[in-house]
C-alpha cells in the first residue's frame, strides 16, 4: 500500500465522545508515525455510540479505511463477525479498542494466571462502575453494559475462553424502554469454572478484579482496568507477591502502536482475538433479549 511503500505517517480521524477523543489525541503524540487529521485520512478511531458502529465501520471499510473502534464493535455477534470478514476482504485493519488489554500489568497478570502460579483457575470476577455521567438525558449516552461490559468481560474471555455453558443476566433499567441499564450483573458457568461481571453507571462498587485459583488468587485493586499493580496471595501471607508496572497512557499508547504496526506490516498485532470481539458483541445483544432478569 501507499502507506507501507512511502513510510509516511498514518493519518487518522478521531470521531465521537469529546473526552475520549481528547485523551486519544494526547496519547497519539507519543507514537511515532501517527498524525491526527480532520480530512484525507487512512484510518479512523471511533468513539461514537455503539448503535452507530456497524453502519459507520461498514462504510469506512468499503472505502478502504482502517478502523480502530472503541468496544463494542457492533450490537450483535452476527454484525461483528460480518465486519471482520469485510475488513479481511478489503485488506483493512479492524481493531477493537479496549485500552486495558494493552497495559503492561494486565498482560503480565494474564501470563501469570495462565502459567499455573495460582493453580487451576476456578473463578474470575470483575467489577467496573462509574457515576461520572449526567444521566438527566439518556440521548447519545452509553448504557452500563456497553460502557463497561467489554472491559469487564475481557479477562473472563481471555482466561476461561468463550465457550461458557450457561449465563444469567440481571439488570436494573432506568428508562421505560428498558434500553438503558443502570446496573447489570452477569454470571457465567463453564464446564470447570465460573465467572461474573458487575457493571454500573447508577451504582457504586469496588472496581476490583479477582482471579481465584486452587493454590492462591490474583487480586487487582480498584480501578483494576487502569492497573499498574497487582498481588498474588496465598494461604501463607509470607509467600504473597506484589507486582508493579509503569502505566503509560492507560494502555491507549500501546493500543495505537499495535494498530499502526498492524497496518504497516499487514499482520495482526491486536491483543484481542476477533472471536473475543464477537463474543463481547453477543453479550451486548443478549442484554437486549427477553431472557434478562429485571430487578
Annotate each predicted stretch with a short phrase.
Residues 22-25, 29-32, 43-46, 258-295:
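C-terminal helix-rich "cap/oligomerization" subdomain common to oxidoreductases
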Residues 74-134:
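A contiguous active-site-proximal alpha/beta segment in oxidoreductase catalytic domains
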Residues 175-177, 181, 190-257, 261, ...:
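NAD(P)-dinucleotide binding in Rossmann-like oxidoreductases
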Residues 11, 42, 122:
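Conserved acidic residues
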Residues 1-28, 293:
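N-terminal Rossmann-like dinucleotide-binding module
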Residues 69, 94-96, 220:
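Hydrophobic residues in well-ordered beta-strands that form the structural core
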Residues 135-205, 210, 275-278:
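Rossmann-like dinucleotide-binding domain that binds NAD(P)(H)
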Residues 26-86:
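Beta-loop-alpha module in the N-terminal Rossmann-like domain of NAD(P)-dependent dehydrogenases
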Amino acid at each position: 500500500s501507499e502507506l507501507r511503500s512511502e513510510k509516511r505517517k498514518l493519518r487518522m480521524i478521531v470521531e465521537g465522545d469529546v473526552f475520549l477523543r481528547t485523551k486519544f489525541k494526547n496519547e497519539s503524540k507519543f507514537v511515532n508515525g501517527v498524525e491526527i487529521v480532520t480530512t484525507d485520512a487512512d484510518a479512523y478511531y471511533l468513539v461514537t455510540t455503539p448503535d452507530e458502529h456497524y453502519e459507520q465501520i461498514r462504510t469506512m471499510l468499503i472505502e478502504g479505511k482502517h478502523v480502530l473502534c472503541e468496544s463494542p464493535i457492533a450490537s450483535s455477534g452476527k454484525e461483528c463477525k460480518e465486519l471482520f470478514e469485510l475488513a479481511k476482504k478489503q485488506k483493512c485493519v479492524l481493531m477493537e479498542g479496549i485500552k486495558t488489554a494493552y497495559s503492561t500489568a494486565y498482560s503480565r497478570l494474564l501470563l501469570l494466571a495462565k502459567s499455573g502460579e495460582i493453580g487451576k483457575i476456578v473463578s474470575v470476577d470483575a467489577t467496573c462502575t462509574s457515576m461520572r455521567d449526567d444521566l438527566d438525558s439518556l440521548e447519545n449516552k452509553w448504557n452500563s453494559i456497553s460502557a463497561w461490559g467489554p472491559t469487564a468481560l475481557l479477562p473472563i474471555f481471555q482466561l476461561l475462553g468463550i465457550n461458557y455453558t450457561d449465563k444469567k443476566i440481571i439488570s436494573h433499567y432506568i428508562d421505560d424502554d428498558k434500553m438503558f441499564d443502570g446496573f447489570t450483573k452477569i454470571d457465567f458457568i463453564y464446564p470447570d469454572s465460573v465467572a461474573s461481571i458487575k457493571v454500573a453507571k447508577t451504582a457504586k462498587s469496588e472496581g476490583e478484579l479477582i482471579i481465584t485459583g486452587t493454590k492462591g488468587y490474583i487480586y487487582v485493586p480498584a480501578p483494576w482496568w487502569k492497573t499498574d499493580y497487582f498481588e498474588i496471595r496465598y494461604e501463607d501471607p509470607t509467600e504473597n507477591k506484589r507486582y508493579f508496572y509503569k502505566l503509560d497512557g492507560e494502555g491507549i499508547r500501546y493500543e495505537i502502536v499495535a494498530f499502526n504496526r498492524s497496518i504497516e506490516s499487514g499482520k495482526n498485532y491486536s491483543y484481542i482475538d476477533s472471536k473475543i470481539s464477537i463474543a463481547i458483541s453477543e453479550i451486548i445483544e443478549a442484554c437486549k433479549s427477553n431472557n434478562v432478569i429485571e430487578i
